[in-house]
């Protein structure tokens, strides 16, 4: 807290008055890092989530999720070791992190509800299982494993995640069309040129 106050040019008490605990500072840092300039702190209120919710097909909806959520993970990923270390010694940090994770899952649940309501999930796939699949695969820890530990580019990682989730969530013919060369579902997205590796 002393270092934050010093860097901000304010009194330590000002930092404590604003954030109260180190856990609150850490979570605020994650939310700030995850956002874009002038974007709302709450992910579900960001413009790209509106595009996800309004997408006309399940393939496009999934492609937008992969494109934008992983951009967030690229920004917050470097903070995860600090979260892990702080959680092991400060229960407040652990609780705050779990709260953030729970909000992420709830937001993903709202998106899965849209897939289900529009009949975009493959036959027999229960929405709760679909949520587990997205929540398990689309996360910062997996992003770090592939991009840092395996050395993949962001585009390759996004293409893999899209192909993996499309195969698990979408009806086979929808997934096949979304993964096809020249697919309009991904034509304007960063990972389009890497899809051939996983289709």
Where are these regions (language model features)?
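Helix-turn-helix
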Residues: 1-28
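Helix-loop segments that flank and shape redox-cofactor active sites
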Residues: 1-6, 85-91
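Hydrophobic alpha-helical connector segments
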Residues: 22-24, 28-31, 35-74, 131
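Phosphate-coordinating loops and pocket residues in cytosolic domains that bind phosphorylated ligands
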Residues: 27, 85, 148
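Amphipathic alpha-helical packing segments from all-alpha helical-bundle domains
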Residues: 64-84, 91-118, 128-132, 164-167
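C-terminal peripheral helix-coil segments that are non-catalytic and often amphipathic
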Residues: 71, 106-121, 131-199
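Short, hydrophobic secondary-structure boundary micro-motifs
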Residues: 81-83, 95-96, 123-124, 145, ...
């Amino acid at each position: 807290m002393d270092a934050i106050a010093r860097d901000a040019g304010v009194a330590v008490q000002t930092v404590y008055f604003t954030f109260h605990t180190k856990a609150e500072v850490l979570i605020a840092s994650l939310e700030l890092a995850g956002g874009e300039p002038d974007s709302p702190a709450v992910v579900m209120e960001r413009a790209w989530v509106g595009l996800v919710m309004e997408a006309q097909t399940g393939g496009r909806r999934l492609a937008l999720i992969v494109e934008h959520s992983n951009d967030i993970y690229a920004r917050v990923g470097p903070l995860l070791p600090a979260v892990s270390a702080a959680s092991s010694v400060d229960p407040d940090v652990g609780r705050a992190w779990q709260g953030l994770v729970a909000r992420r899952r709830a937001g993903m649940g709202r998106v899965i509800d849209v897939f289900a309501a529009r009949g975009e999930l493959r036959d027999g796939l229960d929405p709760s299982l679909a949520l587990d699949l997205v929540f398990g695969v689309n996360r910062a820890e997996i992003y770090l494993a592939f991009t840092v530990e395996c050395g993949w580019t962001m585009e390759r990682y996004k293409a893999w995640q899209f192909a993996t989730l499309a195969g698990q969530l979408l009806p086979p013919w929808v997934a096949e069309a979304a993964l096809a060369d020249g697919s309009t579902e991904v034509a304007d997205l960063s990972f389009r040129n890497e899809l051939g590796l996983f289709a």
